[in-house]
From Swiss-Prot:
Top-level taxon in the UniProt lineage: Bacteria
Record protein name field: Glycine cleavage system H protein
Organism, as annotated: Halorhodospira halophila (strain DSM 244 / SL1) (Ectothiorhodospira halophila (strain DSM 244 / SL1))
Chain segments annotated as coiled-coil in the UniProt record: none
Record Pfam families: GCV_H
UniProt cross-references to SUPFAM superfamilies, sorted A to Z: Single hybrid motif (SSF51230)
GO annotation, biological process: glycine decarboxylation via glycine cleavage system
Residues bearing PTM N6-lipoyllysine: 65
UniProt keyword list: Lipoyl
Length: 130
C-alpha cells in the first residue's frame, strides 16, 4: 500500500491537500498516482493568479507512459506553481508529499476542504480500485 499521510486531505482524482498556517493549501498528486504514472518527465503547474474551480483540470503531469490532468481540489486563486518541477519533474516521484508539490491555492471557500477525503477514506478508495 502506498504511503497515505494522516494529516492530509485527498480527492477521488488522487490529489492531496495540505492546509498551511496562512490558510492557503498546497496541492500535489498522491504516491499512488505517481506510482501508477511511472517516471515523470514533465510537469506543467498553473501560473500564479490563475482562478481555478473545484474538480477542474488545471495542471498536467506527463510520464513515459501517459499524460494526466491534475484537478483543483477546491476553488480559489493559484498563488504559486512549483516552478522547480520544470527542471526536476522526478521530485513528484521521489517526494510526492514534499518537494513534489504542484501548486498552492488561496481557497475561495474553505468549507470545500471539509468535503475532501481523510486518509482512511482515501485508502479505502485506492483499495476498491484494486
Amino acid at each position: 500500500m502506498s504511503q497515505v499521510p494522516e494529516d492530509l486531505k485527498y480527492t477521488r482524482n488522487h490529489e492531496w491537500v495540505r492546509v498551511e498556517a496562512d490558510g492557503s493549501v498546497t496541492v500535489g498528486i498522491t504516491e499512488h498516482a505517481q506510482e501508477s504514472l511511472g517516471d515523470l518527465v514533465f510537469v506543467e503547474p498553473p501560473e500564479a493568479g490563475t482562478q481555478v474551480q473545484a474538480e477542474e483540470a488545471c495542471a498536467v503531469v506527463e510520464s513515459v507512459k501517459a499524460a494526466s490532468d491534475v484537478y483543483a481540489p477546491i476553488s480559489g486563486e493559484v498563488t504559486q506553481g512549483n516552478e522547480a518541477l520544470a527542471d526536476n519533474p522526478e521530485a513528484v516521484n521521489t517526494d510526492p508529499y514534499g518537494d513534489g508539490w504542484i501548486m498552492r491555492i488561496q481557497p475561495a471557500d474553505t468549507s470545500e476542504i471539509d468535503g475532501l477525503l481523510d486518509a482512511a477514506a482515501y485508502q479505502e478508495l485506492v483499495a476498491d480500485e484494486g
